Amino acid sequence: MNSLLATPPVPPHFYEHCRLSPSRSMSSTNPSGNRKRKAEDDYLPSDHDTRMSASPSNSPAFSPRTLPAPRQIKRSRPNISGRPLALSRLLETLDTDALRSILRSMCDRHPELASEVVQTAPRPSVSSALQVLNNYQSALQSSIPLGGNSSSDYAYNRVRQHIVNLLDALSDFTPHFLPPNESQVSTALNYLDGATEIIHRLPRWDTPQHNLEKDAAYEEMAKAWILVIREAGKRGGGIQLQYGGWDQKLSKHNQTAGGKLQDAVNTLSSNLGWMGNQDLSNSQGGDASSIRQQLLSGTYGSGMPLKVGPW
């Protein structure tokens, strides 16, 4: 019965809503078109929601800002190659002996540099000069053979060169600290005190001939003491000799040297005796003149206590 009823025709305006957009593909090969709808598809955002949630990048109110590009600091990388040390760094690696050897060789090759080095170098002090002499003394003591007789001819032959080195250095340093090259008497006296002590430490040998070098050193040191004592007596009335205790120091040196410095002791005694007599006469003359002035002025005895009663 139903088949006999004709199907009414669909109005034409219904076809306009079912017309597909030409931009969409009519291909039936798209698998998503035949895929069944699942429950999780309801929770997926649609194209409309995505477009609404997207930031309005094309809006004129929100113009995009360009971030500054990170700065790239380029460091220069020089080519690594070998080169010699600078003079300042080279001198830092040298010890005292090496520097001394270099200066000596340069002065030997170029004599005009010797005077410049002497003028540029600082003046040696008493402590530095005595330190050099003590170094020679230490080298001498370490060369003495252990065991046996330390004053024998064998021991002397072992240390003879060290004795020569010490005495040569002593003869070079001593004139440097004597007037007129040294203007300070106290500096000269301090050097002579230390240098004489170094001579005391020279060994005595069994053979008298081997002791001539030490005796000659005492004679030269006695002459140096006499020169400085006379110069000190001319300056300031010899006050440094009188109040410096040098009479006791020189007397002790003479006793240790076995009387080799007796001439220097006599010179010092004569200077101290002259200064003592001068001080005594000055004090006596001063007392006499003082009493005379008090008598003339009538003030003599004013400061003395007055005695009452029988004398």
Curated annotation (Swiss-Prot):
Subcellular location as annotated: Cytoplasm; Nucleus
Stretches with biased composition (Low complexity): 21-32, 53-64
Main subcellular location of this protein, as a coarse class: cytoplasm
Domain of life: Eukaryota
Record keywords: Cytoplasm, Nucleus, Protein transport, Transport
MF term (GO), any: proteasome binding
GO biological process: nuclear protein quality control by the ubiquitin-proteasome system; proteasome localization; protein transport
Region listing for Disordered, in residue ranges: 1-81
A Pfam family that the UniProt record links to this protein: Cut8
Composition bias, Basic and acidic residues: 38-51
GO cellular component, one term: cytoplasm
Described purpose of this protein according to its UniProt entry: Involved in ubiquitin-mediated protein degradation. Regulatory factor in the ubiquitin/proteasome pathway that controls the turnover of proteasome substrates. Targets proteasomes to the nucleus and facilitates the degradation of nuclear proteins.
Family: Belongs to the cut8/STS1 family.
Subunit structure: Binds the proteasome.
Protein name: Tethering factor for nuclear proteasome STS1
